[in-house]
Amino acid sequence: MIENRPIARVIAHLMLVLGIIIVAFPIYYTFIASSMTSNDIIRPPMSLLPGDHLSANYTEAMVGGVERVVGVSLERLLFNSFVVALAIAIGKIVISFLSAFAIVFFRFPFRMGFFWMIFITLMLPVEVRILPTYKVIVDLGLIDTYAGLTLPLMASATATFLFRQFFLTIPGELVEAARIDNAGPFRFMRDILLPLSRTNIAALFVILFIYGWTQYLWPLLVTNDAKMNTIIIGLKRMVDFTDASTPWNYVMVTAILAIIPPVMVVVLMQRWFVKGLVETEK
C-alpha cells in the first residue's frame, strides 16, 4: 500500500511544475517574440508580455514575408515537411512490419542472418552511411525530389527489431488457429497481427513522424532548389540571412508554426497510448 505523505506529494508536484516550466518557457518565449518587431526582439531585455504585432507578423509571414527572405513561401516549407514526415513514418512502419512478419512467421534459409544484417546497421555511424547513400541518389537523378528526400530514410532497423520482439510474444495458439481456419499469410496478418499491433504502430508513428519532421542533414544534402526545402532548412536559412539583418520576427513565427503539426500528431494519437495501457491486447 502506498502511504499518503503530504511532504512527498508537495515535492512531487513542485518537481512537476518545475519540469513544465523548463519545457514550456522556451515555447512561451518564442510565442511572445513572434508578436514583436525584429528590433524589439534584439533590444535587451526583451519583454515577457505579448507585443502589438502578433496578427501582423503572422499575416506578413504567410503572405510573402518568409518568401522574400528565403525564396520560398512558408506554406510550401510546411507542406514539404509534412510530406517528408508522413512518407518516412508510413514507409518505415510498412517496411519494418513486413520485414518482421517475414522473419518471425516464415521459414526460409538464413532468415536470422538477414535479421542480424538489418540489426547490425544500428552500429554504423550516420557518416558511414550518408555518403554512399547520397552517391546513389545522385546517380538515380533524385536530387530535389520527394523520393530523394524520403526513400533513403524509410528503412528502420529499430522498428523492425521492435516489431519482431512483439511478434515473438504472439501465442502459438493464435497461429495454429489461423492455420486450422485455412487463413493464408495475408489474412493472418490483416485479421490478427494488425489489430494486435495497433498501439505499437501508433506509438511508432508518433516517434517516426517527429523524426521525419525534424530532419536537417539529409534534406540539406539532397535539395538545391529552395522550393524543396523543409521547414527546418527554411529556419536555418532565415537565421543565416545575409542581405540584411536577420528577420527575427519571421523566424519566431516560423518556429511556432513548425511546432504545431508534431504537437497535433501527439494529441490526436494520445488516446491510442492510453488504450494500450488500460486494455489487454492478447
From Swiss-Prot:
Keywords: Cell inner membrane, Cell membrane, Membrane, Transmembrane, Transmembrane helix, Transport. The keyword S-adenosyl-L-methionine does not apply. The keyword Amino-acid biosynthesis does not apply. One of its GO terms (biological process) is transmembrane transport. GO terms for cellular component: plasma membrane. It is found in: Cell inner membrane. The chain crosses the membrane at residues 14-34, 86-106, 112-132, 146-168, 201-221, 248-268. Part of the ABC transporter complex UgpBAEC involved in sn-glycerol-3-phosphate (G3P) import. Probably responsible for the translocation of the substrate across the membrane. The complex is composed of two ATP-binding proteins (UgpC), two transmembrane proteins (UgpA and UgpE) and a solute-binding protein (UgpB). This is sn-glycerol-3-phosphate transport system permease protein UgpE. It comes from the Bacteria. It is a multi-pass membrane protein. Pfam families: BPD_transp_1. The lineage of its organism: Bacteria, Pseudomonadati, Pseudomonadota, Alphaproteobacteria, Hyphomicrobiales. Belongs to the binding-protein-dependent transport system permease family. Residues 78-269 form the ABC transmembrane type-1 domain. Its main location: membrane.
